[in-house]
Amino acid sequence: MAPFLSAHGESASSSSSSSPTPSRHTRNQHVDYSTPGSTGYNIPQNTTWNAPSNRKIRVLTIGAGISGILMAYQLQKHCENVEHVVYEKNEDVGGTWLENRYPRAGCDIPSHAYTYQFALNPDWPRFFSFAPDIWAYLNKVCETFDLKKYMRFHVEVVGCYWQEHAGEWVVKLREHLPNHEVREFEDRCNVLLYGAGVLNNFKFPDIPGLQDRFKGRVIHTARWPKDYKEEDWAKERVAVIGSGASSIQTVPGMQPYAKHLDIFVRTGVWFGVIAGNSGSQAKEYSEEERENFRRDPKAVVAHAREIEEQVNGMWGGFYAGSMGQKMGSGYFRTRMAEHIKDERLLQGFSPKFGLGCRRITPGDPYMEAIQKENVDVHFTPVESCTEKGVVGGDGVEREVDTVICATGFDVSYRPRFPVIGKDGVDLREKWDLCPESYLGLAIPDMPNFLTFIGPTWPIENGSVMAPLHSVSEYAIQLIKRMQNENIRSWVPRQDITDSFNDHVQEWIKHTVWKDDCRSWYKNNETGRVNAIWPGSSLHYQQVIERPRYEDFEIHSFNDNPWAHLGMGWTVQDRKGPKEEDVCPYFNVKNIDPKWYEACGGDSRLLVERPEESSQAGQQFLWPTGT
């Protein structure tokens, strides 16, 4: 177990190799055992064990998307004496669900699985919801629990700087005011939570001539212009570059209206069924179904569980050579053949890699759209752009009016601004070649810092919502320990983190992700997988259920790291038996039924657990025996 370090970073267990450790006690040594403070150490008098009042903690969250909203709720519900502020660069909450407004932008996880567990939503309009539906849900969560009071909008983070002595992060911020002026200011926090997301920093493809030669319009799906609508598409020939999730959603949204679509695809796609037993990809919930969900919470829970069980049940198919991999691949190939009648298209889209190497995508509307007369699919990358159009790897120039780049995001995990941790370490440089984390949520050299959906996280298997909830609970445990023990800083050890990542990379070799496929899960130049957690979603949740404090370097504000014991008072002791339970160990639920039966009692009384009040205690009589 790693030693607990003092305020000066000195371990109580450290010793010099050149000389023996001196004894704390020697004969004839005069020691004052009666005068408080005679050793120079004074016990804090007002400290109470597990009392939030011991210390105020300030938490700063970057981003008001899924993660930032979750932390606002969790801190409000579970923490006392904690200040929380969320800075968001956009004008409102929602993150990616506010920003992405391309045609049919939505989630590839069924709606009832893409929900906070404390706020199951009976009002989802369809099985796979679109971005406006998801944004409306997130906004309702914020309004219901009054969470926007913690949030400041139009404020972007420009840099984060760790202050070792103070145990704080200094966060430099830039606010864009309504009068178009810009105000720069600083904030400080004890805990910094990075919730900006990994699919947040979009990038255009590096195609010669795309930005400086082509005379038409160039659009990235992540920044879809509000004024580019159906009536515009009807007049244009449009090129769509990419075959990932945004392309698979955009194409069927544009196809019915566009004059012509040229789609450029260089990688096959697994068009799959996700929780197919619970609803079709086009299913809309009727008002009767939604009313039933509103009236009966058990019904909405049962539906969410049915979906989640099917999604999580896919996990076994991701192991290379497994029966699940073989059966799943065969089923999906057969299903694709049923939907794609054109043999050239079927062969072009059929992946040359295992099921799951790239994210499995629900794509029934896409498979239908690519077979329409106004759509041509080219299985080639775009090599360059001319003034009038695009040139594929086949050397053919195709004239278009607009180029849509459905090419994803910068998934290097590197923050867009300086994050300077211990000893001047810049997270951007630390992650320049190879992003590695501790359990997907913490990083060596970055004290009091947690990231949501970091490298090596369960992004590949189902909904992110349950793992995110586990990360939020992990953060709360650390914050409460900081309060109780007056901890200045905690940071995962580099050697422990290295060993964890060695395990991850060895584990990858047993899975489908070792295959040669282009995916944002991996570095496509080196082939190293950076995104995947080495286990199922449920596996991750159980692993991080409680922090492994032995994996951390922990520094206290106190020279004596046991000063947080104070004068020995608990909250219950301070308030007394009229307000608190001062003997919680005497409890009906602690009685072993076998023992109670041996004493002549009826153990069913224990199962029913009568009310543990003073009156219930008077009514509950021990058997006299025989």
From Swiss-Prot:
Which positions does UniProt annotate for NADP(+) binding? Answer: G106, C107, D108, S243, G244, A245, S246, S247, I248, Q249, R266, T267
State whether keyword Manganese applies. Answer: no
Q: Where is the composition biased (Low complexity)?
A: 1-23
Q: Where is this region: Disordered?
A: 1-47
Query: What keywords were assigned to this record?
Result: FAD, Flavoprotein, Monooxygenase, NADP, Oxidoreductase
Which residues does the record give as FAD binding sites?
Answer: T96, W97, L98, E99, D108, I109, Y114
Copy out the induction comment: Expression is positively regulated by the dothistromin-specific transcription factor aflR. Dothistromin biosynthetic proteins are co-regulated, showing a high level of expression at ealy exponential phase with a subsequent decline in older cultures.
Q: What is its EC number?
A: 1.14.13.-
- Cofactors: FAD
A GO molecular function term, named singly, is: N,N-dimethylaniline monooxygenase activity
A Pfam family reported for this protein in Swiss-Prot or TrEMBL: FMO-like
Site feature (Transition state stabilizer) residues = R359
What is this protein's name?
FAD-binding monooxygenase moxY
